Amino acid sequence: MAAMETETAPLTLESLPTDPLLLILSFLDYRDLINCCYVSRRLSQLSSHDPLWRRHCKKYWLISEEEKTQKNQCWKSLFIDTYSDVGRYIDHYAAIKKAWDDLKKYLEPRCPRMVLSLKEGAREEDLDAVEAQIGCKLPDDYRCSYRIHNGQKLVVPGLLGSMALSNHYRSEDLLDVDTAAGGFQQRQGLKYCLPLTFCIHTGLSQYIAVEAAEGRNKNEVFYQCPDQMARNPAAIDMFIIGATFTDWFTSYVKNVVSGGFPIIRDQIFRYVHDPECVATTGDITVSVSTSFLPELSSVHPPHYFFTYRIRIEMSKDALPEKACQLDSRYWRITNAKGDVEEVQGPGVVGEFPIISPGRVYEYTSCTTFSTTSGYMEGYYTFHFLYFKDKIFNVAIPRFHMACPTFRVSIARLEMGPDEYEEMEEEEEEEEEEDEDDDSADMDESDEDDEEERRRRVFDVPIRRRRCSRLF
């Protein structure tokens, strides 16, 4: 009878051998592993088995074997100590920490000054004080990032990328939390928005909405864009850059460390290159990368400003007699409505570069569209240096430009039909007055219009408005 009772006794978790139990425990998350400590003495002992905590230390805190050796602690102690420090950010820490580690590793040999400009992480009490100052809670992923690095010193070049034209320069620094708090917005149009970046040259900032207000989603990151057609200063449109701080920061880092954003003169330039945007004619290859400039763009009126960087390279295996010089360019420019403009002119940016085997020539130019997207394509005309009478064309691949997703100001959406009609009438009257003023000197006006058109597409940057500083 006793033998039968032994054979039919139910198999419990407690009765399992140690190895199978440890295997089962290895599949548990850290929360369940901690809960097992309160079930029984045996499970408590097994849940403290140090190798079980190795996976969690690596998964949540990215702690390496080298760090463990340096700290001379067991895995469980490391997990508990780190959790006691940044445990509230456990859902964000790994993604944010990896992005920071990847970014610094990539930039150290390329932009050492930029890495040296990074500040030490902020303390919890510092972040709490900022929340008390602005009267709003900071997003947890934002706090997590600032525990690792509290922004950077306000220096050039900025960590969040640069852009340079002949008469325009932008370089965005990542603000420390105290400086950001000083620029926290309470005014209509940007209510409850905290600046993330700042450019000392243009006053441009990227903002994060710490509360949902005025049509913005909470935690959304955007460039502000004043509505120049509205009389209400609270009418501010937005170019959306990220759904959350994590989305914004990690996507930027990915573009940098993948080589998507080129490093030029120790600066990160925010040009996007489509790998398919390359054309080869004979021994010459032309590739294009583009960038949208929010500080020179507007939704109302529709004016979208883009810059592009073109690389012209001759194969190093080309014969010496293939050396040639660029004579002219031809552009076919198409906007989103299908309207086409054709332009041709001598050289590029006032130069007539010579291309020889292995040589690379790069230049930057810009264009604008009245639609949210468009594309350009065309060709260069070259002549051989050794056979000057022989000319040939080199294809420029079609490259597309599109502005980011934007959201129209709620102030405009809430505008009454009478008010909107009155505003349009005033704008039409202003345009008519401008036309009357210009009619006295029509010939000069025609020349100016032609110059404006040529400057727009003839590789000469246009001087536009600069965003005013907001703090």
Curated annotation (Swiss-Prot):
InterPro entries: ApaG_domain, ApaG_sf, F-box-like_dom_sf, F-box_dom, F-box_SCF_Substrate_Recog, Knr4/Smi1-like_dom, Knr4/Smi1-like_sf. Pfam families: DUF525, F-box-like, SMI1_KNR4. GO terms for molecular function: ubiquitin-like ligase-substrate adaptor activity; ubiquitin-protein transferase activity. Residues 278-408 form the ApaG domain. It comes from the Eukaryota. GO terms for cellular component: cytoplasm; cytosol; nucleoplasm; nucleus; SCF ubiquitin ligase complex. The keyword Endoplasmic reticulum does not apply. Pathway: Protein modification; protein ubiquitination. It is found in: Nucleus. Residues 419-455 are annotated as: Disordered. Keywords: Host-virus interaction, Nucleus, Ubl conjugation pathway. Residues 10-56 form the F-box domain. GO terms for biological process: protein ubiquitination; proteolysis; response to lipopolysaccharide; SCF-dependent proteasomal ubiquitin-dependent protein catabolic process. Residues 419-451 have a biased composition (Acidic residues). Its main location: nucleus. NCBIfam families: PRK05461.1. Substrate recognition component of the SCF (SKP1-CUL1-F-box protein)-type E3 ubiquitin ligase complex, SCF(FBXO3), which mediates the ubiquitination and subsequent proteasomal degradation of target proteins. Mediates the ubiquitination of HIPK2 and probably that of EP300, leading to rapid degradation by the proteasome. In the presence of PML, HIPK2 ubiquitination still occurs, but degradation is prevented. PML, HIPK2 and FBXO3 may act synergically to activate p53/TP53-dependent transactivation. (Microbial infection) Associates with the Rift valley fever virus NSs to form a remodeled E3 ligase that triggers efficient proteasomal degradation of targeted proteins. The filamentous E3 ligase targets the TFIIH complex leading to robust inhibition of antiviral immunity and enhances viral pathogenesis. Part of a SCF (SKP1-cullin-F-box) protein ligase complex SCF(FBXO3) consisting of FBXO3, SKP1, CUL1 and RBX1. Interacts with PML, interaction is direct and takes place either alone or within the SCF complex. (Microbial infection) Interacts (via ApaG domain) with Rift valley fever virus NSs helical filament; this interaction forms a filamentous E3 which mediates degradation of TFIIH complex through interaction with GT2H1. This is F-box only protein 3. It comes from Homo sapiens.
